[in-house]
């Protein structure tokens, strides 16, 4: 009976150590970004040895996957399926941008750092691929129903893509000082103006 208890306790300790490493990684990625986070910094923050980090996560990809899964579970992306139920494309865009910009506000540190660091790490790009696909799907959902054709359709699609970009939100609410709601309204007007 003592052996089973010891095995269970050991498994719990391993899980707790892994969780500390993941939490430390998430915190450092939010603060510094994935490219500037070192294994030494993760180990220090998690209060473990570097070798312990490597035992749990033998490569960048496995560490990024664990970090991404943990962070995403705490910060779910807006539900694009709900927007598909809104028939009017302008109202759909307005509702979506309000949710998207609120999401960006809550996740600004991590989102900004990950986007900045994507070009530096093939492992990060691989782990972020579902995120890239999500944003492509969002653009498809928000592109539906507008009455634009030909060149205007191309411009409208670009305007929708611009409206949902983190960098657009960051510029409008940071440098330009708009609220999330005012930034969303401005982007709805921009896309509407492209439609004509």
Where are these predicted regions, by residue range?
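Short, hydrophobic secondary-structure boundary micro-motifs
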Residues: 38, 112-114
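Hydrophobic alpha-helical connector segments
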Residues: 66, 77-109, 132
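Alpha-helical DNA-contacting segments of helix-turn-helix folds
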Residues: 29, 64-71
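Basic, helix-initiating cap at the start of DNA-binding domains
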Residues: 1-51, 56, 62
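Short helix-capping/turn signature of helix-turn-helix
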Residues: 57, 116-120, 163
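Hydrophobic/aromatic-rich alpha-helical bundle segments in the mid-to-C-terminal region
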Residues: 144-190
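Residues in the recognition helix of alpha-helical DNA-binding motifs
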Residues: 56-57, 186
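Short, basic, alpha-helical segments at the C-terminal edge of helix-turn-helix-like DNA-binding modules
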Residues: 39, 68-76
């Amino acid at each position: 009976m003592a052996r089973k208890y010891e095995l269970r306790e050991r498994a719990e300790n391993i899980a707790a150590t892994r969780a500390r490493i993941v939490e430390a990684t998430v915190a450092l990625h939010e603060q510094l970004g994935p490219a500037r986070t070192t294994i030494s910094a993760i180990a220090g923050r998690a209060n473990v040895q570097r070798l312990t980090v490597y035992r749990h996560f033998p490569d960048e990809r496995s560490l990024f996957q664990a970090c991404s899964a943990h962070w995403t579970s705490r910060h779910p992306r807006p539900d694009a399926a709900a927007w598909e139920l809104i028939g009017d494309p302008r109202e759909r865009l307005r509702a979506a941008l309000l949710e998207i910009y609120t999401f960006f506000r809550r996740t600004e540190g991590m989102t900004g750092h990950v986007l900045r660091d994507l070009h530096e790490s093939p492992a990060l790009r691989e782990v972020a691929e579902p995120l890239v696909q999500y944003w492509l799907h969002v653009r498809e959902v928000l592109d539906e129903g507008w009455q634009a054709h030909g060149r205007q359709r191309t411009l409208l699609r670009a305007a929708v893509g611009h409206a949902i970009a983190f960098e657009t939100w960051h510029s409008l609410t940071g440098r330009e000082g708009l609220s999330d709601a005012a930034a969303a309204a401005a982007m709805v007007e921009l896309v509407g103006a492209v439609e004509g």
